[in-house]
Amino acid sequence: MDAKALWQRYQEWLYFHEGLGLYLDVSRMRFDDAFVKSLLPKFDKAFADMAELEKGAIANPDENRMVGHYWLRNPDLAPTPEIAQEIVQTLEQIEAFAEKIQTGAIHPPKANRFTDIISIGIGGSALGPQFVAEALAPEFPPLKIHFIDNTDPAGIDRILTHLRNHLASTLVLVISKSGGTPEPRNGMIEVKKAYAGQNLDFAQYAVAITSTGSNLDKVAQSEGWLATFPMYDWVGGRTSEMSSVGLVPAALQGIDVRAMLEGAKEMDDATRVPEVKNNPAALLALSWYYSGNGKGEKDMVVLPYKDSLLLFSRYLQQLVMESLGKEKDLDGNTVYQGIAVYGNKGSTDQHAYVQQLREGVPNFFATLIEVLEDRHGASPEIDPGVTSGDYLSGFLLGTRQALYENQRDSITVTIPQVNARTVGALVALYERTVGLYASLVNINAYHQPGVEAGKKAAAVILDLQTKVVGLLQKEKTALSLEQIAEKIGAADQVEAIYKILRHLQANQRGVVFQGNLGQPSSLKISLS
């Protein structure tokens, strides 16, 4: 296609949201009108499905749940007055709590005010808050946030060591729907011990964000924690940024949460339009379907050309892959759906993997995120008439052109600046896109059976560890791996037993290996 035809195609397929100043350009996705027409019946169904979802239909049939994250930014849509009232009241409580913390009206026993936050959570309880903190927190926030988002002891130590002289002024958020998810539970226990080690009463520093009646809720109530905010069963982790999960840490950092909600609401309104060309989420879903033939055959590479949006690709990775990565469709057919997502930031990636994107395996489509405003205020010239921001813009446009010239598709999303409204809009845009795409390919976007399977498998390993250690505590002689497996009735788990024992031995847990470490079957194992 020559330059004139490309310009015409750009104008034909350009979407612009005047209120948000957001542009969506899908002109470099090479679908034709016949392809779009062929998908219109699927889109009619997707729009209808989404309308029913917003009315409170059971959109997550596997767990028999409503899906209501859209109600969070427009409570009037909620299916009952009780849900609407709870959403409104919770937001007011979050804002009031954040103000009291920031002003010192609520303060720790040994300091005039809180200065830091430890946020403990995993998955959607971490990725959304991390992305928003990186994108929107002021340079000098009223409270500086630190995340524990894993059960890695060294990672936990790193945070606690950094804050060892500030624990007495550090607020702790524990974010877990059930309170039983291992990663946040483990993090909470370790942090509790750190506070106890400094003779600090953990309850006077702790806030729970959890389901009403959960184990965590019961602990918070019985111990008298500072506050508890709700998580709803109709909001999944990966779509929870506009709930207490995201709003509490954001408000504490001084981020305008109402502006974020307003941006999301404006985007929700735009993505309700039942016309593909006039609905930005539908245009994205169309592009995803085209690129991967409706089967996820190509990866999505996300390149935000703005440092503050660095974590957007990680946020989208969970939102897209956990929602769309499914073995079965809604009819029970085996389909192996999903879209792999990865990325970092531009122009850094042009010195990393864009070489492969331009000339290597064409197994992807790119999503370029453009921010029109370079910085607040004027920029100095680097060259005559040229700023560093001009270079960044040039790199984005150059990458887009270079990819297209080599038959590699791309989408460009443009926002005027990074602020609470535009970040809220971006989150809402991709939440809706995932929902529409899921309807196009007939899958449940709102459950995660693979994650649950992984949790169960981990529990089996820990149970096996308990049996192995219990046996070795009773045995007076060293045993081989095969003997251990046989004695605990796990003859088919020799490899797992070996790896369990190797980990225990490396962490000074009393396990003694005798024999050739390079030949596991030769080892004799005992406890010291």
Swiss-Prot record:
Assigned EC number: 5.3.1.9
Organism of derivation: Nostoc sp. (strain PCC 7120 / SAG 25.82 / UTEX 2576)
UniProt function note: Catalyzes the reversible isomerization of glucose-6-phosphate to fructose-6-phosphate.
Pfam families (UniProt xref): PGI (PF00342)
Catalytic residues in the record: E322 (proton donor), H351, K455
GO biological process: gluconeogenesis; glucose 6-phosphate metabolic process; glycolytic process
Lineage: Bacteria, Bacillati, Cyanobacteriota, Cyanophyceae, Nostocales
PROSITE patterns from the UniProt entry: P_GLUCOSE_ISOMERASE_2, P_GLUCOSE_ISOMERASE_3
Superkingdom of this protein's organism: Bacteria
SUPFAM superfamilies reported in the protein's UniProt record: SIS domain
Keyword terms: Cytoplasm, Gluconeogenesis, Glycolysis, Isomerase
Main location: cytoplasm
Enzyme class, broadest EC rank: isomerase
A single GO cellular-component term on record: cytosol
Catalyzed chemical reaction(s): alpha-D-glucose 6-phosphate = beta-D-fructose 6-phosphate
Pathway info: Carbohydrate biosynthesis; gluconeogenesis; Carbohydrate degradation; glycolysis; D-glyceraldehyde 3-phosphate and glycerone phosphate from D-glucose: step 2/4
Name of this chain's protein: Glucose-6-phosphate isomerase
InterPro entries assigned: G6P_Isomerase, Phosphoglucose_isomerase_CS, SIS_dom_sf, SIS_PGI_1, SIS_PGI_2
Family of this protein: Belongs to the GPI family.
Protein's UniProt keywords contain Transcription regulation: no
Subcellular location: Cytoplasm
GO molecular function, a single term: carbohydrate derivative binding
